[in-house]
Amino acid sequence: MKTSQLFYKTSKNANKSAAVLSNELLEKAGYLFKVSKGVYTYTPLLWRVVSKMMNIIREELNAIGGQELLLPLLHNAELWQHTGRWEAFTSEGLLYTLKDREGKSHCLAPTHEEVICSFVAQWLSSKRQLPLHLYQIATKFRDEIRPRFGLIRSRELLMEDSYTFSDSPEQMNEQYEKLRSAYSKIFDRLGLAYVIVTADGGKIGKGKSEEFQVLCSLGEDTICVSGSYGANIEAAVSIPPQHAYDREFLPVEEVATPGITTIEALANFFSIPLHKILKTLVVKLSYSNEEKFIAIGMRGDRQVNLVKVASKLNADDIALASDEEIERVLGTEKGFIGPLNCPIDFFADETTSPMTNFVCAGNAKDKHYVNVNWDRDLLPPQYGDFLLAEEGDTCPENPGHPYRIYQGIEVAHIFNLGTRYTDSFEVNFQDEHGQTQQCWMGTYGIGVGRTLAACVEQLADDRGIVWPKALAPFSITIAFNGGDTVSQELAETIYHELQSQGYEPLLDDRDERLGFKLKDSDLIGIPYKLILGKSYQSSGIFEIESRSGEKYTVSPEAFPTWCQNHLA
């Protein structure tokens, strides 16, 4: 391709509204054009990168028996009502919904579990057809409340999604491991630093679930890593530092605490460490047909993990109760909530079980109790793991070793769904005895746009984008000074020779200074630059520079061999 033919535009100035580096550079380098909030045009330059990534995905998925198809973007509401997700998604405003001329409700696809199940249910008949792996690379729509960070959180997104159907839990697990391995190979080929972490399945499903997280300081997700094990902080199980508590129970006392509403102020008032305080939070659980308030007791020095609470209690959504809701439900103010005389169900994190002679509130303003003990003063609560992991906590999967905390960008997510969706759509098969059996399902997805943004975030430098070799839109830039007709003729010859050998050169034939062209090449992220400047004119030797700064001097005779070693 010649720059005179390529429809692109670079900019000297960054977009001031771009919140993250990847968004800034992708727009500045001519890869991305913003149409509206969370909606972007993928320019010809970016589509070259996308096409290469899609080819890598196809190669790895086809190698394990995947079959590509294309599912519709427009879904009728009845499909989603089969699984109850229409109500769940519409209540949160995540769906783009519309009605056709007959008044029937539809949505633009945020995911495709319902559609794929309705299809497979009609065509699947025999166990001999299993395991089955179908996948697509297509657009998804999600009405994000706060679309931001360019391709990292957009309203219209490009994804690969795979679906597997199996005859048993064992075969489902085998398919899960195959997809896990294939996804690993995809990200290995991209040369990204990533970790696979245990995750919460969220609204997709509650079975085994893992995320592929690209390590990046900008990452939206917090991940806990210990050795080879990792977990999203939403799902991380951890063992916090232990504390010694009194063995002898002391007499309980009521103490006036006017205006003391924070844990820190309470610790100062009683001159005790935070871990001797039982703090209580009120949360609102949302279900399809009701809302429920519960209280959660936590050790004073630790934070609650709301995702774990929602998962434990099978809630569709969860939030901390507002001050007004606390006063309405408990008749007291925030800061004075506790297990004593609590009118709502009381749960507590497992780390509160060893606590003795602790301080807690009693659901009355300006009043706390000291030397409170389970069993003697309170009925034991309903315990659960509601702890938010912190750096330094011990990892139970790697005994004796602490977690390190990193930020990451989730680029892929894999799930075992069991029979949650196949039951709803009666995705069944006949076994060898003619008996009807249920299918076991898995779902898997790679965020194509997110992965490209993660590449930029992780690899970019102060000169611009640094694409992995496997994704770069062109393999080498051929650059010369505008107006230098001798160098231009040579550049044309080299360009056509490289094209004939299957390489992807970009001939910068603009009437611009050589330095300007080299800066553009670095901004765009092309791996190599062939520079036809003064050095070549004086020596007849090609000067080549890699995007990382390595320099090569290559004779015209040795140039084909150099290309085989570096561009192939």
Curated annotation (Swiss-Prot):
One of its GO terms (cellular component) is cytosol. It is found in: Cytoplasm. Its EC number is 6.1.1.15. Signal peptide: none annotated. Keywords: Aminoacyl-tRNA synthetase, ATP-binding, Cytoplasm, Ligase, Nucleotide-binding, Protein biosynthesis. One of its GO terms (biological process) is prolyl-tRNA aminoacylation. One of its GO terms (molecular function) is proline-tRNA ligase activity. The keyword Transferase does not apply. It comes from the Bacteria. It holds the Pfam family tRNA-synt_2b. It catalyses: tRNA(Pro) + L-proline + ATP = L-prolyl-tRNA(Pro) + AMP + diphosphate. Belongs to the class-II aminoacyl-tRNA synthetase family. ProS type 1 subfamily. Consists of three domains: the N-terminal catalytic domain, the editing domain and the C-terminal anticodon-binding domain. Homodimer. Catalyzes the attachment of proline to tRNA(Pro) in a two-step reaction: proline is first activated by ATP to form Pro-AMP and then transferred to the acceptor end of tRNA(Pro). As ProRS can inadvertently accommodate and process non-cognate amino acids such as alanine and cysteine, to avoid such errors it has two additional distinct editing activities against alanine. One activity is designated as 'pretransfer' editing and involves the tRNA(Pro)-independent hydrolysis of activated Ala-AMP. This is Proline--tRNA ligase. It comes from Chlamydia pneumoniae (Chlamydophila pneumoniae).
